[in-house]
Regions:
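N-terminal glycine/serine-rich phosphate-binding loop of ATP-dependent small-molecule kinases
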Residues: 1-94, 122, 213, 226-232, ...
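Core alpha/beta catalytic barrel or barrel-like domain that forms the active/cofactor pocket
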Residues: 210-216
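Local beta-strand N-terminus motif with an aromatic residue
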Residues: 69-70, 208, 395
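Carbohydrate-associated surface elements
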Residues: 101
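A structural motif corresponding to the C-terminal end of an alpha-helix
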Residues: 200-207
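Extracytoplasmic/secreted proteins and extracellular or luminal domains
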Residues: 63-66, 204, 391
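Active-site core segments that coordinate phosphate-bearing ligands/cofactors
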Residues: 5-6, 105, 112-126, 132-175, ...
């Protein structure tokens, strides 16, 4: 039996997972880390704590499993989150600015007003938004004096979380095309940093990592990982797409976690969205041409359930929400738009704020809980409808993964609203599996068509609602969305 493993560094926790050659989880360990909120627009992580949790996860697994048996390791990570550290000391200059952070809206407004850079920005496939790394780097340069000073000595590296982990493991500065494609500084056609964007905002190209294919050799760690080669690096959502075996054009998946992230494989074609979606790199295998995707992102999915629990105390645990929501046959006319820090795709409205509408004396916590769950399905509908418009074709089946797929009420409602079949695989850790599988494919030099690991369906849901009812629900959702827009 052969084994391959994954470092899965997410928004709220780090994990190390070992898989066997059949895709079964052999061992794993997970550790949550601290979320910092310096003000209402800011979300930060401690890069040192992130690394410490990764180390601890690997050590805990090593107590139970001989990691020398592992043939290869993949890294998958929260994307866009940006870290700046010293090349000479390895110490961070500042906390990691997380993808959810919106403090840089003024910088984004400044960028959008500058016509001289619009053509270059369009080549990134991304809209100008606080979500991506560019505005975070500009903010760090302007607001952290030690960074500005150290840049004059070529002693700064700006990187996404994958680059930070690769550095801590190997001492090198590397990233892959999927993570680079989330920075707003990467030309998705040439697969290089866009030097015009860098020069415009005084970001030295020497302060950025070397860009490599997703499936390639990133080196190894002498001590922690016993010289096991790191042969794949992917952003978390691309790893999920890969783990779902969406290797052919037109395959689509949606991940339900802290946020929601839907991706469709567009093959070697770069599809620039006209409907508010992102164009991104899905993966690149060695020197082959990259595979592209279009993506829709929702900021608040599972995070909305956490808000019910932590801020409103309507539920005590996240798992309770399904039973509470099932206490009522429907939402009682209540709709919730979780635009806590604006709306992502396809609306892209940073001035939107959360609204709870349709309340009456009849409304109760069960209706509100149901509305929070249903908001996840409605937001996903908006993403997937936009995808079909961009591609000029519809899809029949949606592959789903993430923690929220355990919620049967949500998945059935999603099938009803989409009017499509939904399936989930029997591998729950699909993101980590995707990165580990990619590493295994590279080390074995397999063709994607030769991957014969059988992913069985664990659950499926089919639509079971009248078209008239569906249209009524969607009409009310669209009215609620309009209420949330242009709030500030």
């Amino acid at each position: 039996m052969e084994y391959f493993a994954s470092i899965d560094q997410g928004t709220t926790s780090s994990r190390f997972i070992v898989f066997d050659e059949n895709g079964n989880v052999t061992d794993q360990h997970q550790i949550e880390f601290t979320q910092y909120f310096p003000n209402e627009n800011s979300v930060e992580h401690d890069p040192v704590e992130i690394w410490d949790t990764v180390v601890q996860c690997i050590k805990e697994v090593s107590k139970r499993f001989d990691i020398k048996k592992i043939k290869s390791i993949g890294i998958t990570n929260q994307r866009e989150t940006t870290i700046a550290w010293s090349k000479s000391t390895g110490k961070p200059f500042y906390n990691a600015i997380v993808w959810q952070d919106t403090r840089t809206q003024d910088i984004c407004d400044e960028i959008m007003k500058d016509d001289s850079i619009k053509s270059d920005l369009s080549r990134t496939g991304l809209p100008v938004a606080t979500y991506f790394s560019l505005s975070k780097i500009i903010w760090l340069i302007r607001n952290v004096p030690t960074i500005k000073k150290s840049l004059t000595n070529n002693d700064v590296i700006f990187g996404t979380v994958d680059t930070w982990l690769i550095y801590k493991l190997t001492g090198t500065f590397q990233t892959d095309v999927t993570n680079a494609s989330r920075t707003l500084m990467f030309d998705i056609e040439s697969l290089q940093w866009n030097e015009n964007i860098l020069k415009k905002y005084n970001i030295p190209i020497d302060s950025l990592a070397e860009i490599k294919p997703s499936l390639s050799n990133f080196g190894s760690s002498n001590n922690l990982l016993k010289d096991i080669p790191i042969t794949a690096v992917m952003g978390d959502q691309q790893a999920s797409l890969f783990g779902q075996h969406c290797f052919t054009k037109g395959k689509v998946k949606n991940t339900y976690g802290t946020g929601c992230f839907a991706l469709t494989n567009t093959g070697e074609d770069i599809v620039y969205s006209k409907n508010g979606l992102l164009t991104t790199v899905a993966y690149q295998y060695g020197n082959d041409k990259p595979t592209y995707a279009i993506e829709g992102s929702v900021a608040i999915a599972g995070a909305g359930v956490q808000w019910l629990r932590d801020n409103l105390n309507i539920i005590q645990t996240s798992e309770e929400i399904e039973n509470i929501a099932l206490s009522e046959k429907d939402n009682g006319g209540v709709y919730f738009v979780p635009a806590f820090s604006g709306l992502f795709s396809p609306h892209w409205d940073p001035t939107a704020r959360g609204v709870l509408v349709g309340l009456s004396r009849h409304s109760n916590k069960h209706h509100i809980s149901r509305a929070v769950l249903e908001s996840v399905a409605y937001q996903s509908y908006d993403l997937l409808e936009s995808m079909e418009k961009d591609l000029g074709q519809s899809f029949n089946e949606l592959k789903v993964d993430g923690g929220m797929v355990e919620n049967n009420l949500l998945m059935q409602f999603q099938a009803d609203i989409l009017n499509k079949n939904i399936v989930t695989r029997d591998i729950k850790e699909i993101t980590a599996y995707g990165a580990a599988l990619a590493s295994y494919i590279f080390i074995k030099q397999l063709k994607l068509s030769e991957v014969n690991i059988n992913l069985n369906y664990a659950s499926s849901w089919s639509p079971n609602v009248d078209a008239q009812v569906r249209d009524k629900y969607l009409n009310n959702w669209n009215k609620a969305i309009e209420k949330a827009k242009n709030w500030i």
